[in-house]
Amino acid sequence: MTRTASFLIVAVSVLTASIAAGQETSRPPASLSGEWVLTTVVFGNERSERMNLQVEKGKVTGWVYRRRKRIPLAGKTDGVNIQFGIQDGDSKSSYTGRIVEGETSGKVTVTGGNPWGDEPPAGWHARPAVSERERPSAPRTLDFEPVEFHRVFSSSIKPVMRIWPGDTVRTRTVDAGGVDERTRTRVLGGNPQTGPFYVEGAMPGDVLVVRIRKLRLNRATAISDDGLVDRALTSDYAAEHKDTNFNDVVWKLDAEKGVATLARPTARLKDLAVPVRPMLGCVGVAPGFGAAPIRTGDSGRIGGNMDFSEIREGATLFLPVSQPGALLYVGDGHALQGDGELNGNALETSLDVEFAVDVQREKSLSGPRVENDEYLMAMGLGGSLDEAFREATSALAEWIEKDYTLTGPEAAILLGATIQYQISEVADRNVGVVAKVRKQFLPKGEPKKP
């Protein structure tokens, strides 16, 4: 069965400009060889993939990166017209187009199983991936002062800044209720985020590396409450405390001493002083092809509202990339949080944030990972503790098998003797379990590079 659709193809914006006698003129590209971003539009949704083209004497070869592997493509071009096909299982997509000043219109024919269902794609376009020649000569430190904050993780929000791997960003967040460092309400509550930041070169199938350089308190108060979430309680205890109203509890933050105390303590808690440990409740990227925006109170493969107390200064996060540029968001600052976020929130406050980014190419992950000087930590996020426990254990086992070249039995021996667990979050739709192992127990030498 063959389905053919005609549609606009903005082929590869490989527009080359020359300036002569003060006048800008355009000409067709000298070569199509190189790396591209191939985007297929399906029912108004864009699916972007890394594509590599090599052209020699009119012959086109290359691949697209899809489902953790490179799918070959082949075709031909005369410099004005281009044709290539992608064989993906039972499905073959044949692309044709005419190159005119870097833009092309054409058609695609899908033969065999159609990966998009009963209808063919509505269109496709491609552009050259960023060239290393465009990379700044040295990593930069960039300041970003947020004006707007967002309550969803989405690919449709315009990036606030384009940054390169190696760059460092200094910015700030509002608290979970939308209150800033001057105690002004800037946005509705619900974990509003700073961002998104577009990371050049990051593509679906890659891993975004986020290194948290600094987290600093920037105001003197935080807010929590006086209730425990039902998910953490027995039915008897919950019934006994059914009249709990989750009243706000105000904390005073002393950044110089590094402690938090109650602003209006009860007699029994008048001496309570706890050391602050600033952390980010939310670090996330945009969801992938066909996915609706994800609210900032939720978590999953994208990261998001993970509320894990080790996402703090000195930690490195690894997040699967699902959109070009990754589209990184940060927010939901906590001065301190106990495991599980049992109050339904933590010591909620605004923060000054400094982070750096990097990209690991073609190293797909099932979900978020965290690393610090002492531990490797794999997060499991699911609807139940059982599900999250299985996700976390499997993810950590896969991590040490692949990066430290261990066999399954070797990983089982190591984890059976050394694995530790934390319950990171029980307050939201997904619960979080973190499986972790001390790095001192891992095989010596550098882990395998992606």
How does the language model describe each region?
Residues 6-17:
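Bacterial N-terminal signal peptides
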Residues 217-312:
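Intrinsically disordered, low-complexity linker/loop segments enriched in Gly/Pro
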Residues 145-154, 186-193, 294-302, 396:
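Short, structured beta-strand/loop micro-motifs enriched in basic residues and often containing a Trp
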Residues 176-187, 215-225, 325-335, 424-427:
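Short, Lys/Arg- and Gly-enriched loop/turn segments at beta-strand edges
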Residues 23-125:
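Central antiparallel beta-sheet cores of small beta-barrel/beta-sandwich binding domains
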